[in-house]
């Protein structure tokens, strides 16, 4: 396996990560809990975040035991909270009666509580739909991450971008303003991009590297795919893993992120992922 392949991230809402077999030569395993939202039902809470992952399966005690399991090993494990949404449901907003500073204050307080309760290491920002102007998004999200980092509540901060131009512009601006507080960028390869039919692998690889170039100063650029069949509309799993095989020798790519959500929603078992990644990364 290429020594450049270092980070493996699982994006999940349940405890499927507990039995995950980590791909060979990985130096860091990240679990990203999906999701915390500042919504109570369908109503925005203007920065007051609530865990919406399976809190019966993923408890503070479960995370404590998970981390303890790897203490004797050389593998670093980190657990992050992901804030965001999917499609048009629960979009980012600071509320009609709110403002950026008020949102940042409320978000910092609520996420501080979640991070301390669950002993989390970082935050991931993954909004696919943003119902705010660019300045409000950048100032709010950037201010939140800055507060968490400066108060030493987290050690890892990432955001997820894609080929969706309307969405990506928000993250370009966020990174331009707050680059020092983000160490990881995740590219959601299945969102907003359809590879050419003539040469899908080459066109997907070209797109990934173009996006990676926009964030070339970041510590870790991860390429993401999904085990959920509804996310496969633009291209199938084999296209992704063949593309990953070609990318892992490239210094621009530091690892992979796999969206599992739960064992119940995955269209191929999570236990296959390490084997597929090993095949993709073998040289």
From Swiss-Prot:
Highest taxon of the lineage: Eukaryota
Please name the catalytic residues of this protein.
128
Taking every annotated instance into account, which residue ranges of this chain make up the domain GH18? 5-283
What molecular functions are annotated in GO for this chain?
hydrolase activity, acting on glycosyl bonds
Induction note = By fruit removal.
Does the entry annotate any disulfide bonds, and if so which pairs?
none
Q: Which SUPFAM superfamilies match?
A: (Trans)glycosidases
Stored Pfam families: Glyco_hydro_18
Q: Which keywords accompany this UniProt record? A: Glycosidase, Hydrolase
Does the keyword Hydrolase feature in the UniProt annotation? yes
Keyword Metal-binding applies: no
What InterPro entries is this protein classified in?
A: Glyco_hydro18_cat (IPR001223), Glycoside_hydrolase_SF (IPR017853)
Q: Name one GO biological process term.
A: carbohydrate metabolic process
Expression sites (tissue/organ): Leaves.
Question: Which protein family is named in the record?
Answer: Belongs to the glycosyl hydrolase 18 family.
Subunit structure comment from the entry: Forms part of the RuBisCO complex.
Q: Supply the name of the protein.
A: RuBisCO-associated protein
Organism, by scientific name, is Glycine max (Soybean)
């Amino acid at each position: 396996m290429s020594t450049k392949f270092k980070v493996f991230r699982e994006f999940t809402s349940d405890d499927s990560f507990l039995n995950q077999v980590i791909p060979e030569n990985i130096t860091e395993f990240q679990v990203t809990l999906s999701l915390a939202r500042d919504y109570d039902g369908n109503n925005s809470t203007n920065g007051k975040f609530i865990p919406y992952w399976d809190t019966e399966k993923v408890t503070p005690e479960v995370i404590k035991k998970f981390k303890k399991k790897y203490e004797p090993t050389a593998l670093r494990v980190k657990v992050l909270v992901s804030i965001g949404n999917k499609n048009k449901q629960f979009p980012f907003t600071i509320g009609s009666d709110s403002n950026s500073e008020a949102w940042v204050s409320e978000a910092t307080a609520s996420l501080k509580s979640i991070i301390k309760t669950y002993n989390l290491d970082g935050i991931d920002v993954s909004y696919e739909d943003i119902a705010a102007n660019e300045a409000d998004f950048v100032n709010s999200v950037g201010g939140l991450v800055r507060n968490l980092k400066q108060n030493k509540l987290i050690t890892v901060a990432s955001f997820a971008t894609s080929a969706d131009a309307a969405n990506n512009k928000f993250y370009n601006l966020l990174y331009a303003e707050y680059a020092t507080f983000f160490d990881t960028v995740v590219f959601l390869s299945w969102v907003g991009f359809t590879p050419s039919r003539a040469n899908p692998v080459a066109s997907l690889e070209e797109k990934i590297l173009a996006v990676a170039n926009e964030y070339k100063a970041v510590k870790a650029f991860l390429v993401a795919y999904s085990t959920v069949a509804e996310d496969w509309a633009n291209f199938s799993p084999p296209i992704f893993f063949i593309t990953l095989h070609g990318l892992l020798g490239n210094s621009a790519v530091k690892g992979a992120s796999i969206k599992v959500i739960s064992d119940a929603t995955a269209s191929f078992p999570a236990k296959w992922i390490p084997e597929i990644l090993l095949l993709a990364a073998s040289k």
